[in-house]
UniProtKB/Swiss-Prot annotation:
Keyword presence, Cytoplasm: yes
Lineage of source species: Eukaryota, Viridiplantae, Streptophyta, Embryophyta, Tracheophyta
Subcellular compartments: Cytoplasm
MF-aspect GO terms: ATP binding; phosphoenolpyruvate carboxykinase (ATP) activity
Protein name: Phosphoenolpyruvate carboxykinase (ATP)
Stretches with biased composition (Low complexity): 109-123
Family annotation (Pfam families): PEPCK_ATP (PF01293)
NCBIfam families according to UniProt: pckA, PRK09344.1-2, PRK09344.1-3
Annotated organism of origin: Zea mays
Length: 666
């Protein structure tokens, strides 16, 4: 969210560094409720006493539950294949071939036959909507499970409002939902199956976000989740990841909540009718049984929540959390594994295209201004969070945006404000019970309120979300120590060092009585999602930068003239001028001088930016305090990098040695 000067505010609460040293950028505190009823009471605010509070009569949907899904499908063979595919998805260990899947409702057909209804001619049987509910018959033939296929947003609205308590339409047309007791990700409950392949490929041990589980435990949880889903009406969505058509991933999401289905409809790339017809077997499947807990006495489980990833089976199982962001970030982790195997670099970054067609990547943690700076109306937005860099250029992984909503204001972030309309999912927001107007300043449920909407809702979005090879790689840091320059040009080794470090600084909340800035490091600016060792991603980044002529930059959006509490935050207009100078190529021909300790090259002048702020030492009145804070920050960088210092690619440590030499020098 923006502060008065327009930059994203610094987070002060609700985030903790985990025991293994990994900083989880968007995990959040538990919901502020003790019971489900209390949670629902927090969602809706009572209207003011002067506002009449009348209950409008409810009009039932005509035609019953199945009426929206009664149109045609012509290819009988293709439909049969789809039914077989659904059956395979819902197979479990005790039902290896999956439940029998038939068209229509066998119970309804039986009733019609008993009443002497004439049979329907075959020609008419084929006229059905592609989203018609398939009925999966359990082995015992005593239960029926509706499988709703690729519903539209309007149909998902109907399902959510009718069957999911806590689902409402807001005054702007968005769907307000509740994610239950979990209002943020649960990184400590994420597990990855460790087998012969992943034991060698993935990053394990200190600092890694990957917590192991075995195949047997995964199958136990998968069985539990699939059996639960088989007892319900489930929604199946088929979506795509990666706008690069040569490197797309086909994803199937099976969930029990329309909210989850609409969320993924917005966040993934929405296939055309032709792409759906030729969809075939998915590359990855998510089983979201988040309403049902895992057995916490199962091996490797530490709570009733578990997010399990099996890369060999290409499946993810979610239990015990209804927070939709687990699906988004789970798939991002999958892309962090699959794409590098194809020689494609996956990145946790924003990306835009300048007015002259040049592309820039923006890396940064919360509060650095990544969204603010990458969403520039002088250019086009390729994406705000997840990207791939291949030999074809850069491409957005997703088809939507997942924006924070706390303290959202129209005048500060009009693009996000205007995107909250019909089709958008609003998570855990509070609204007026009568008018349905959302109060974005109210965090009664959680501070981690979010909006998920298609990227087409942003006016400056570039569709398709692809671009040429980036010319600039911009690493953003909000330095609350006030010792990093507003902009520095980096050599390749420095780019790798600062990319692996993933530095920013947080300011402790005043309620704690602590005024000291707190350094935060998140490897590759997304430690919670990476699968391989950070040095592998850094090496791929350097290789592509060298191959395609990209330049690395370190941009400080934090403090100048003193640390937090003494100096002032660098003004947003100055930072925008710096970004403009990077886009235009002005800084490539500027004169540079080198700083102490970090050895950063800083320009002596930039058009529209006061020269006296370019070298931080000249903005401090207390030079001794500057030196003290500079050495302190350098020491924090050194300490953080110790966990990466011994890494070798094969038996060769030369790359790591080169990267280490680019760090602070005392």
């Amino acid at each position: 969210m923006a502060t008065p000067n327009g930059l994203a505010r610094i987070e002060t609460t609700g985030k903790k560094k985990q025991d293994n040293g990994v900083w989880y950028d968007d995990s959040s505190a538990p919901v502020r409720a003790q019971t489900i009823d209390e949670l629902h009471s927090l969602q809706r605010k009572r209207s003011a006493p002067t506002t009449p509070n009348r209950s409008a009569p409810t009009t039932p949907i005509k035609g019953g539950a199945h009426s929206p899904f009664a149109v045609a499908i012509s290819e009988e063979e293709r439909h049969t294949q789809q039914m077989q595919s659904i059956s395979a998805s819902l197979a479990s260990l005790t039902r290896e071939t999956g439940p029998k899947v038939v068209k229509g409702d066998p119970a309804a057909k039986g009733e019609a036959a008993a009443q002497g209804a004439p049979s329907t001619p075959r020609a008419h049987q084929q006229h059905r909507h592609p989203a018609a509910p398939a009925i999966a018959v359990s082995d015992s033939s005593l239960k029926f499970t509706h499988v709703l296929n690729n519903l539209s947003p309007a149909e998902l609205y109907e399902q959510a409002i009718k069957y999911e308590k806590g689902s409402f339409i807001t005054s702007t047309g968005a769907l307000a939902t509740l994610s239950g007791a979990k209002t943020g990700r649960s990184p400590r409950d994420k597990r990855v199956v460790k087998d012969e392949v992943t034991a060698q490929d993935l990053w394990w041990g200190k600092g890694s976000p990957n917590i192991e589980m075995d195949e047997k435990t995964f199958l136990i949880n998968r069985e539990r989740a699939v059996d639960y889903l088989n007892s319900l009406k489930v929604v199946r969505q088929r979506q795509l990841l990666n706008w690069d058509p040569e490197n797309r991933i086909k994803v199937r999401i099976i969930s029990a909540r329309a909210y989850h289905s609409l969320f993924m409809h917005n966040m993934c790339i929405r296939p055309t009718d032709e792409e759906l017809e030729d969809f075939g077997t998915p590359d990855f499947t998510i089983y979201n049984a988040g309403q049902f807990p895992c057995n916490r006495y199962t091996h490797y489980m530490t709570s009733s929540t578990s997010i399990d990833l099996n890369l060999a089976r290409r499946e993810m199982v979610i239990m015990g959390t209804q927070y939709a962001g687990e699906m988004k970030k789970g798939l991002f982790g999958v892309m962090h594994y699959l794409m590098p195997k194809r020689g494609i670099l996956s990145l946790h970054s924003g990306c835009n295209m300048g007015k002259d067609g040049d592309v820039a990547l923006f890396f940064g943690l919360s509060g650095t201004g990544k969204t603010t700076l990458s969403t520039d109306h002088n250019g086009l937005l390729i994406g705000d969070d997840e990207h791939c860099w291949s030999d074809n250029g850069v491409s957005n992984i997703e088809g939507g945006c997942y924006a924070k909503c706390i303290d959202l204001a129209q005048e500060k972030e009009p693009d996000i404000w205007n995107a909250i309309k019909f089709g958008t999912v609003l998570e855990n927001v509070v609204f007026d019970e009568h008018t349905r107007e959302v109060d974005y300043a109210d965090y009664s449920v959680t501070e981690n309120t979010r909006a998920a909407y298609p990227i087409e809702y942003i006016p400056i979005a570039k569709i398709p979300c692809v671009g040429p090879h980036p010319k600039n790689v911009i690493l953003l840091a909000c330095d609350a120590f006030g010792v990093l320059p507003p902009v520095s040009k980096l050599i390749l080794a420095q780019t790798m060092y600062h990319f692996i470090s993933g530095y920013t600084a947080l300011v402790a909340g005043t309620e704690d009585g602590i005024k000291e800035p707190q350094a935060t490091f998140s490897a590759c600016f997304g430690a919670a999602f990476i699968m391989l060792h950070p040095t592998k991603y850094a090496a791929m980044l350097a290789e592509k930068m060298q191959k395609y002529g990209a330049t690395g930059w370190l941009v400080n959006t934090g403090w100048s003239g003193g640390r937090y509490g003494v100096g002032k935050r660098i003004r947003l207009p100055y930072t925008r001028k710096i970004i403009d100078a990077i886009h235009s190529g002005e800084l490539l021909t500027a004169n540079y001088q080198k700083t102490e300790v970090f050895g950063l090259e800083i320009p002596t002048e930039i058009n529209g930016v006061p020269s006296e702020i370019l070298d931080p030492i000249y903005t401090w009145t207390d030079k001794a305090a500057y030196k003290e804070n500079l050495l302190r920050l350098g020491g924090l960088f050194k300490n953080n990098f110790e966990v990466f210092a011994s890494y070798k690619i094969g038996d060769d440590s030369s790359l790591t040695d080169e990267i280490l030499a680019a760090g602070p020098n005392f």
